[in-house]
Amino acid sequence: MAVIKCKPTSPGRRHLVKVVNSDLHKGKPFAGLLAKKSKSGGRNNTGRITVRHIGGGHKQHYRLIDFKRNKDGIPAKVERLEYDPNRTANIALVLYADGERRYILAAKGMKAGDKIQSGIDAEIKSGNALPLRNIPVGSVVHAVEMKPAKGAQIARSAGAYVQVIARDGAYATLRLRSGEMRKVPVDCRATLGEVGNAEHMLRQLGKAGAKRWRGVRPTVRGVAMNPVDHPHGGGEGRTSGGRHPVSPWGQPTKGYKTRSNKRTDKYIVRRRNKK
């Protein structure tokens, strides 16, 4: 995959940086693994905006991804790689020996024709899914479960991975990209290797309209509002806000910790690194 900086033939292309995925399927997705995806416009069931800056965008289908990788002992072949508008990673359509097709996250280096497998007997190679108890310490993995058979929750975005750094009894210790070290049951599954499409972080959309295509609406600064609308609003002329940055509801932002889940604190060995 290559990164291309476009020539400035128009203002919208002047800052455009694209990731060229020439190996992706150019046709339609596999219809049997699509689901309806309705847009909410950021509104809840009462019609009130609960998430700002959401609305519009291109119509999309949801791709049903196999995050459990529980089809053990049956080899599969990667038919093709596809773009998925619902995530930063690319996805792979795999065909199992019994004829079933599933979508999985495309691992780094995965290509059409590759053979993959799940289960405790699977080979230690990128794209194969095994329980953490069967993965060698020091291995790099992605799509990691937090509870056995629940489905992958950790390291699912483009270029993401975690490292298995220890295994003690019923738990394996993982080092996340943030620096956090966390315990996970050894019966949880993980896929070997990194998530592909790591170049996603290098892209630049180039113009505001590209954000609108993705369903993202403009963000108005608090200092540009009236006092009734935001704690930073009002004042004569331009102001800096006059206080530490807060949300429209007065919650400190830019680094303020809001995590409150004492039930799972015991699984965190070390907190993430400070930026």
Swiss-Prot record:
Organism: Shewanella pealeana (strain ATCC 700345 / ANG-SQ1)
HAMAP family per the UniProt record, alphabetical: Ribosomal_uL2_B
Keyword hit for Cell inner membrane: no
Primary role: One of the primary rRNA binding proteins. Required for association of the 30S and 50S subunits to form the 70S ribosome, for tRNA binding and peptide bond formation. It has been suggested to have peptidyltransferase activity; this is somewhat controversial. Makes several contacts with the 16S rRNA in the 70S ribosome.
Assembly, per entry: Part of the 50S ribosomal subunit. Forms a bridge to the 30S subunit in the 70S ribosome.
Annotated gene: rplB
Source taxonomy: Bacteria, Pseudomonadati, Pseudomonadota, Gammaproteobacteria, Alteromonadales
Disulfide partners: none
Protein name: Large ribosomal subunit protein uL2
GO BP of this protein: cytoplasmic translation
